[in-house]
Design a protein with these regions (language model features):
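N-terminally biased helix-coil "hinge/interface" segments that flank
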Residues: 1-144
C-alpha cells in the first residue's frame, strides 16, 4: 500500500519470496486471511500456500529487535500485528479526512465505497474511524 508497497514481487512476507512484512501479513497472522482459501501460487516455485510461519517468524524477530532498541519487554507477535494494523487503518482514515473533513465535509452521512484487493479487509474499520455507518463492497472490488 502506498509508495513503499511490497508490490506483487516479491510481495508480502507471506508470499514466501523474501518480501517484507506488510499489512497483508498482519491480516494473515491475525487469521483474517485464511491460506486454505487461496490457491497455492506462492513461494519460490509458485506452488505453495500463503506462509503463516514465515510471517510469525518475522514478527517475532521484529518484536525482539524493537525490545532491544527500546529496552522494553518484548511484545508478542499478535499484539505487534494488531498494533501495525491499527496504525494502517488510521493512516487510511486520515487520508480521507485530509480530502474531506479538513475541507468542511461531514462524511458521517456518506457511504464508504471500497475497491482494490484489500479494500474489503479494511473498509469497515476505516468507516468506523470516520463515523461512517454504511459501507459498500462491490462484488468486483478486487478488480476495480
Amino acid at each position: 500500500m502506498g509508495p513503499e508497497s511490497a508490490g506483487a514481487i516479491p510481495g508480502p512476507a507471506s508470499y514466501g519470496k523474501g518480501g517484507p512484512l506488510t499489512v497483508t501479513d498482519c491480516n494473515v497472522l491475525l487469521g483474517k486471511l485464511h491460506p486454505e482459501h487461496f490457491p497455492s501460487v506462492f513461494g519460490p516455485n509458485g506452488n505453495a500456500p500463503l506462509d503463516v510461519e514465515v510471517v510469525r517468524k518475522k514478527f517475532t524477530e521484529l518484536s525482539k529487535y524493537v525490545a532491544q532498541q527500546t529496552k522494553k519487554s518484548q511484545m508478542d507477535e499478535i499484539s505487534m500485528a494488531e498494533g501495525f494494523l491499527k496504525i494502517a487503518i488510521e493512516n487510511m482514515a486520515n487520508a480521507i479526512k485530509k480530502i474531506s473533513i479538513q475541507k468542511g465535509y461531514d462524511v458521517t452521512n456518506y457511504t464508504m465505497n471500497c475497491f482494490g484487493g484489500a479494500g474489503g479487509q479494511h473498509a469497515c474499520h476505516v468507516a468506523d474511524s470516520l463515523g461512517i455507518t454504511n459501507v459498500l463492497i462491490h462484488p468486483y472490488a478486487g478488480v476495480l
